[in-house]
């Protein structure tokens, strides 16, 4: 997929880059798989901001994605490759032989006309197929990995993401994530073969503030530009710094301090990500 540049008709367009849409099929989405999600804009049920720098953004419809991939024994044909406003990878519309249609994440190399299937075992190792981890050969690249059998894929779903199956141990398999982390996952969990497509997403330049506003991202004010009552970095004469190590608005260390809480799943992490 090619990176697209724009002529600088205005100063804001000079550095903008985007992704070409040549891989997208020119046909409307399946209406039965579209649903309207409420825009919370970072507010809770009381209307108070619980997640800063968020807004509704441009209007969009959510595509219902089949993350579970448990339609066993029925082959499907890729009918279309579509844009999804809620995620940074493309999605593929699968038309199954029994007449049902579902969306899945498009892995790299999957195109219109390809045949995909899901089963517990016995499928070809090709992009788009899905099997239980215990039946996938060691060394295979996978994505959309479940953490609990039957719950649906929770890991490795964004553009260009992948993991490699490194080994098998009784009821667990060992995955190496793109970050370098090695972790165990239950062997009964499902996973899709291949790497998530649209890997060029990481190389685009947003280029202007308005483009982030369309995505629902509001501006972020520096703490040093606030008053002392609003932020630990606030106050002072001119652009004077706060004289302390960088902290969040609530006084917790930032810029590298570890904030991850201990949880029961820590025992499944064999080695942490690179450099950590």
Swiss-Prot record:
Stretches the record annotates as Disordered: 211-276
Pfam families per the UniProt record, alphabetical: Ribosomal_L2, Ribosomal_L2_C
Biased composition (Basic and acidic residues): 230-240
One GO cellular component term noted in the UniProt record for this chain: large ribosomal subunit
A GO biological-process term: cytoplasmic translation
Highest taxon, organism lineage: Bacteria
Keywords: Ribonucleoprotein, Ribosomal protein, RNA-binding, rRNA-binding
InterPro entries: NA-bd_OB-fold, Rib_uL2_dom2, Ribosomal_uL2, Ribosomal_uL2_bac/org-type, Ribosomal_uL2_C, Ribosomal_uL2_CS, Ribosomal_uL2_dom3, Ribosomal_uL2_RNA-bd_dom
GO MF annotations in UniProt: rRNA binding; structural constituent of ribosome; transferase activity
Membership in a protein family: Belongs to the universal ribosomal protein uL2 family.
Function: One of the primary rRNA binding proteins. Required for association of the 30S and 50S subunits to form the 70S ribosome, for tRNA binding and peptide bond formation. It has been suggested to have peptidyltransferase activity; this is somewhat controversial. Makes several contacts with the 16S rRNA in the 70S ribosome.
Assembly mode: Part of the 50S ribosomal subunit. Forms a bridge to the 30S subunit in the 70S ribosome.
Name of the molecule in the record: Large ribosomal subunit protein uL2
């Amino acid at each position: 997929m090619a990176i697209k540049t724009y002529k600088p008709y205005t100063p804001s367009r000079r550095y903008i880059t985007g992704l070409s849409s040549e891989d997208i099929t020119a046909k409307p989405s399946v209406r039965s798989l579209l649903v309207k999600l409420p825009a919370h804009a970072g507010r809770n049920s009381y209307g108070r901001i619980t997640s800063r720098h968020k807004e509704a953004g441009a209007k969009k419809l959510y595509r219902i994605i089949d993350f579970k991939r448990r339609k066993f024994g029925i082959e499907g044909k890729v009918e279309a490759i579509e844009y999804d406003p809620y995620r940074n990878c493309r999605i593929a519309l699968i038309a199954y032989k029994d007449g049902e249609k579902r969306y899945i994440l498009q892995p790299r190399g999957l195109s219109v006309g390809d045949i995909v299937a899901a089963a517990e075992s016995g499928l070809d190792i090709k992009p788009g197929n899905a099997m239980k981890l215990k039946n996938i050969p060691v060394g295979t690249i996978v994505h959309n990995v479940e953490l609990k059998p039957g719950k649906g894929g929770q890991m490795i779903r964004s553009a260009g993401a992948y993991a490699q199956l490194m080994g098998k141990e009784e009821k667990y398999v060992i995955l190496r994530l793109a970050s370098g982390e090695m972790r165990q996952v239950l062997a009964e969990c499902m996973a899709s073969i291949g790497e998530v497509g649209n890997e060029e997403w990481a190389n685009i330049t947003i280029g202007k503030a308005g483009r982030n506003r369309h995505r629902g991202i509001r501006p972020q004010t520096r703490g040093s530009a606030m008053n002392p009552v609003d932020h630990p970095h606030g106050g002072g004469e001119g652009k004077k710094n706060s004289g302390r190590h960088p902290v969040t608005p609530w006084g917790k260390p930032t810029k590298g301090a570890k904030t991850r809480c201990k949880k029961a799943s820590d025992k499944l992490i064999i080695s942490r990500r690179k450099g950590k």
